Every structure is written in structure tokens, then in C-alpha cells.
């Protein structure tokens, strides 16, 4: 195994993410795993993802662990995702904006939109698509997607870069999976108003 950890970011990474990443890097070093880290910044996330994918292919990495810079994850994330033996496997995480829906999708249809998972099986399960906050891909998958599309992450007319990749992969016959034992936090910035404090006091006094 030769692992590339790819982190696309706009301009900065969250401190809590850095703590999680540091623990993971120390664990990989202790276990003598051959790895490299690529933090790629830019205003267009899909281009950052493209550059990470190209490095993985050009430098002959076997896998890419994709981590967004606003994620919180456990130090065993890699071993749990690797245990699936799949070319594509994600952990579970939810959107950081109000509504907080799952970023794991049952279906993606241009005329209907996306259907999110509301509940999760207890074992590894197949999905239609997902966000790329905490995904492990094989370079074999990346090379096939790139070979047939001349891109991995360029957005499609109705799909962002992460779901567009998922569609390209499934169109080639690859199956996408989710490992429910990997649950990540999604760091959000929620404005707090005085009424939020009042609502909180009511919950602790009820």
C-alpha cells in the first residue's frame, strides 16, 4: 500500500481538523505505512481535487484518502475504510448547515434530485453517491475514471464535483460503499443570537 492523503481547501484548515490529521499521521508513521500528504488550496475545489488525483496517478500511489479540511475523525479511520477492500468507500457525515442532512445518497436523478439516507444499515452498504469529506479511493478507480472522461472531478451541469465523480464511477460499473462504523463530525459556523441562549436555558430547565 502506498497512500496519498489529499486535503483540498480554499484558504485555511480548521484547528480541530489539524489535531485529527496530526494524530493520524503519527499513527501511520508508527505503523511504517508509506504515505504522503498533499494539502491543495484554491478557489475552485474541483481543480484542487483534480491536482490531487493527478499526483496519485503520476506518482504511483495505490490509494487516496480524501479528507475535507472541516472534518473531525477518529484515528482509526484508515484501517476501518481499508478493511472494506473496496475501490470506493466513505464514512458517514452530515451537512453543516441547518437541516443537517446526510451527505450519503440513495439516488441521484436529474429530474428528481438527490435522495439522502435517513437511517443507516449496521454493516457496509452500497450507495449511489456521497460528498468527499472522508472517502478512500483506489488509484485503479481514479485511473479508470480519468481514462474514460479525461477528468475526475469537473462538475456536471447539475452536479457538484464530488457527486459528478460518483456518477462517472458508477457509469463505468464501479460500486460505491459506505462503512457505517466510520462517523465523522462536520465543523460548521453557526451564528448565535440571544434567543438561542434562551432556547438553550429552556431545554436544561425542562
Provide a role label for each language-model segment.
Residues 53, 74-154:
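Conserved catalytic core of nucleotide-sugar-dependent glycosyltransferases
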